[in-house]
């Protein structure tokens, strides 16, 4: 019942079954293949690339020895040196402009966040004040209702003691209608 080895050499391990070569035709298929390869061994760590570092230009030299230009007096090789220096300086200036633009946008974004947060707090405070006002009105209405009930109860109790004497006289009357009799 052992698996037969084609090479039949002792001590040689069996080869893994080779996966058929699949060429991705669409980006979605390529992503699916990558995910399948990752999920074959979920214990293995997945490679996550780090964010590339931002390019920084070289600082301009503090002291320039050979100041030259693209004038006719320069030698044939000097023009190329000048051209490279000029290109490097333009790159540095472009970088500084982009950096200042990015900082400006960041500042505007932070200001807008602060402004939005302040507006939200103002709206919340206004609504909170309105809720508190309604709550106070309800409490005052409830207190007024309780006081009016107390006054009515006190009036009823004083009027009920006066009307008790009248009720005794009313009880003495003979009812004109009695249920159950015909």
Swiss-Prot record:
GO molecular function, one term: protein kinase inhibitor activity
UniProt feature, compositional bias: Acidic residues: 164-173
Keywords: Coiled coil, mRNA processing, mRNA splicing, Nucleus, Spliceosome
Coiled coil residues, start to end: 99-157
Region feature (Disordered): 1-80, 114-182
Keyword field contains Kinase: no
One Gene Ontology term from the biological process aspect of the record: RNA splicing
Basic and acidic residues bias (residue ranges): 1-18, 27-43, 114-124, 144-156
Source organism, top-level taxon: Eukaryota
Localization of this protein: Nucleus; Nucleus, Nucleolus
Family per record: Belongs to the PRKRIP1 family.
Role according to the record: Required for pre-mRNA splicing as component of the spliceosome. Binds double-stranded RNA.
Identification of the protein by name: PRKR-interacting protein 1 homolog
